[in-house]
Each structure stands twice: as structure tokens, then as C-alpha cells.
Amino acid sequence: MKLIAGLGNPGKKYDQTKHNTGFMALDHYLSKNNLDLDKDKFEGLWTKQKVNGEDVIFLEPQTFMNDSGKSIAQVANFFKIAPEDILVIHDDMDMPIGKIRIRANGKSGGHNGIKSIMACLGTNNFNRLKIGIRHPQKESVVSWVLSPFNDEQQKLMDAAFEVSENIINDFIKGKNAQYLMNQYN
């Protein structure tokens, strides 16, 4: 069984903001595959589906970004999903807008959602699909991550969401992190 989690903040106020890139990428995948997050439990919206013969949980934690680990750990523990079978999709300010990078483990890179997941799972050995939103140029970090993409930026993000769909499918098919890194980084 696989767990694919998109990170973001719940509520209309945060819809389409840069910090909700994980939600947007997962929503793109779900929409393209006619799937819905139809359950509300484990402090998140989720669904369990069979994709390419594999049982997959798709999850959007509703705990706010900084506590994302609570929801992910609850799902992983309940369904007995190993950390290496988890893929977390999130924004990354250290990469240009729309750039994608896969990581198999490592540090949080200052991302509070990833810090929370590490603390709650007790390991950093889970997969990440990072999508760049770049550092702010003039505005504060908070203002930047909580603002929407402009039209030009959104085109880059839409292209990234298309690539992320392929990455998610390859992950579900059992392609390991090394393969994904070689293919997409």
C-alpha cells in the first residue's frame, strides 16, 4: 500500500496560494483520474483507491502545514504503511517556480510541514516530491507563500503538475526513489 500526501493549509483563505502547492498538485492528479477525497478522518481529507493494481491512500492533511505530520502518521500507522511507501508533495522556496525535485530522505530544508512529518514518523526516510515556488524578492516570506501565483507563474506550475502526475503514477507502479530521481531530477 502507498500513501501520497499533498501538503497545504485548509480553508478558502489559503486556496491557490503558493504554500498550497502540494494540495494543488494532488488535486490535479485526482481530477485527471476522476478521484475525490471522500473521507474526513485522521485529521485529513482522504480516499483509498486501487490504482494500477496497488492500494493507494491519497491524503490532504487538514491540520495546517506546521502540523501535517499528525495526519500523515495517523494514516501510516492505521494502514501500516512503511515510510518508504510514502510520497509527500510540497512547495520548496529554494527552487525556481515550477522546478521539480525528488528526494528519498534528508533534512527538512527549513520546511515546517516536513519537520512535523519527520517528528511524527520518527524518521526522515520518506519520499518527497518538491515543487519550486522560489524565494520572495521583496515581500516577506509569509506574504509570499500565502499569495497566489500570477498568470506567468501559474503556467509554470501547471506544467509542473503535469510532470507530478507522471511521478505519482511511477511511484504507485513501484518505481523506487533512485529511478524517480534519475528520471525526473
UniProtKB/Swiss-Prot annotation:
Catalytic activity: an N-acyl-L-alpha-aminoacyl-tRNA + H2O = an N-acyl-L-amino acid + a tRNA + H(+)
Subcellular location: Cytoplasm
InterPro entries recorded: Pept_tRNA_hydro, Pept_tRNA_hydro_CS, Pept_tRNA_hydro_sf
Sites annotated Stabilizes the basic form of H active site to accept a proton: D91
Subcellular location, principal: cytoplasm
SUPFAM superfamilies, A to Z: Peptidyl-tRNA hydrolase-like
Site residues (Discriminates between blocked and unblocked aminoacyl-tRNA), renumbered to this chain: N9
Transmembrane segments: none
Record carries keyword Iron-sulfur: no
Physiological role: Hydrolyzes ribosome-free peptidyl-tRNAs (with 1 or more amino acids incorporated), which drop off the ribosome during protein synthesis, or as a result of ribosome stalling.
Assigned GO CC terms: cytoplasm
Key words, A-Z: Cytoplasm, Hydrolase, RNA-binding, tRNA-binding
Subunit annotation: Monomer.
Cited PANTHER family: PEPTIDYL-TRNA HYDROLASE
Sequence similarity: Belongs to the PTH family.
Gene Ontology process terms (BP): protein quality control for misfolded or incompletely synthesized proteins; rescue of stalled ribosome
Protein name as it appears in the record: Peptidyl-tRNA hydrolase
Binding positions for tRNA per the UniProt entry: Y14, F64, N66, N112
Enzyme class: hydrolase
EC nos: 3.1.1.29
A Pfam entry, by short name: Pept_tRNA_hydro
Alphabetized GO MF terms: peptidyl-tRNA hydrolase activity; tRNA binding
Enzyme active site: H19
Gene designation: pth
